[in-house]
Design a protein with these regions (language model features):
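Switch II (G3) loop of P-loop NTPases
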Residues: 85-108
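Structural beta-sheet core signal
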Residues: 29-31, 97, 124-125
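A diffuse structural propensity rather than consistent per-protein peaks
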Residues: 82-83, 112
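N-terminal phosphate/diphosphate-binding loop that engages ATP/GTP or pyrophosphate donors
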Residues: 16-80, 89, 93
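Conserved catalytic-core segment of NTP-binding enzymes
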Residues: 2, 11, 20-22, 102-139
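Short, ordered loop/turn segments at secondary-structure junctions
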Residues: 32-35, 100, 128-129
Length: 139
C-alpha cells in the first residue's frame, strides 16, 4: 500500500499526519523533495515521532536550501527538477509519501506535485479547521 500525503498548503500539518500514518502502519517514509530546513527536515521530524523499529526512511531525491516551492528553490540553486528521476523506493513495506507544499505546487515548468501521485495511491489531503477551509480544500 502506498499513501500520498498532501495538503492545502505549507505548514498545514502534512508532516504530523504522515508521521501518525507511518507509525500506525509501521510503514516506510519518503519525502522525494525537501525545500528548506536542511539541518532538520521533515524526515527528521517524522523520525522524532516514530517509536517502531520497522520504518525505513528513504532519502530525498531533491533537497534544496531555499525554503520555497520546489520549482523556485530549484531555480535559485540552478537545478531543474526532472520527475523521471523521482523513482519510488523499492520496499515490501507500506510506503507513506509526503508531498511538498500543496497538491498544485509547481515542480518545474511542466509538472506539479499532483503528477507524483500514482493512480493506485491512497491520497490523504490535510486541511485546517477554520471558516472557509472546505472551500480552500476543494479548490
Amino acid at each position: 500500500m502506498e499513501i500520498f500525503v498532501t495538503g492545502i498548503g505549507t505548514d498545514v500539518g502534512k508532516t504530523v499526519a504522515a508521521a501518525v500514518i507511518t507509525e500506525a502502519l509501521q510503514a516506510d517514509y519518503w519525502k522525494p523533495i525537501q525545500s528548506g530546513d536542511f539541518d532538520f527536515g521533515d524526515a527528521d521530524r517524522v523520525k522524532s515521532y516514530i517509536s517502531n523499529s520497522k520504518t525505513v526512511f528513504h532519502d530525498n531525491v531533491y533537497k534544496f536550501h531555499t525554503p520555497a516551492s520546489p520549482h523556485f528553490a530549484a531555480e535559485q540553486e540552478n537545478i531543474t527538477i526532472d520527475i523521471t528521476q523521482i523513482k519510488r523506493p523499492k520496499t515490501k513495506n507500506s510506503l507513506v509519501i509526503e508531498g511538498a507544499g500543496g497538491i498544485l505546487v509547481p515542480l518545474n515548468e511542466q509538472h506539479l506535485v499532483v503528477d507524483l501521485i500514482a493512480p493506485t495511491d491512497l491520497v490523504v489531503v490535510v486541511s485546517r479547521h477554520y471558516l472557509g477551509s472546505i472551500n480552500h480544500t476543494l479548490l
